[in-house]
């Protein structure tokens, strides 16, 4: 284990002793607000300190097993214990590194996933549809729920733009690194000469704000339009102006929803998306300022960043931020996205760990 990590963990162990003492004091116990605050910190510190205690125990076990290697009667058992202890120490160190990393407070939230067709005309819209299906299928394997909030269909299939709401545990934390430019290289169905075309889509992943996070929108700053919904929806569709579009006049940010059966429901969902987009704009501006100070591999999540290429003739997916190349493109497009997301998570954790080390 790196010295700076051990030093941080020793501080956690010391802090746990301090918190145990504080929680035993009568003046703390009689002040409920202070008691709750200290109890929350105690729970967080206990998780780290407990794993570190286990790590030190396995280090001691490993040292003891190595001493037994010189005893012929104990050597076989010692080798088994060494293998088991070394494997557990690797796992524990990985867990401890994660526990020490600063957490994004939005990680556990639901997310809005916005996919827009870019350069490439009809082929780009078809690819936007492919991406929407890929994320929907991955969500199903993760046990998440997906609903389409709004969709602008293309004449030959696919989407000019589609907004999905993905609900489940840890959705934003898992999908946040999908924001950016996605490029596809393939022979379009409409191509008669067999030439490979390059098209692009942009993806934006935004955490769904909760009631405490939600910004207050001044009604005077909003323009609300109603229109007839289009797309799937049975006989109800196009008979009433149930779809809602909301424009935030100060920023020009627009959100719409046509999935619900009532104008009231669509307005509520459109306002949720609008709040998320306004907050994402503020977040992107902050990230751009931070990126000017330090450039991370995984990137800022700006939709102008080209993050990934999907090459169908080669069956290849390449994520340019971490130089990851996988030759299992068809499986990935069917929702087998876990390996990509896990690699991005590990890369981001390595960045954060390096920042911790340089600050230590």
Swiss-Prot record:
| Compartments, record wording | Cytoplasm
What cellular component GO annotations does this protein have?
cytoplasm
Name of this protein: Peptide chain release factor 1
Q: Which domain of life is it from?
A: Bacteria
Q: Where's it mainly located?
A: cytoplasm
* Species the sequence originates in: Paracidovorax citrulli (strain AAC00-1)
Gene Ontology molecular function terms on file: translation release factor activity, codon specific
**What family does the database annotate?**
Belongs to the prokaryotic/mitochondrial release factor family.
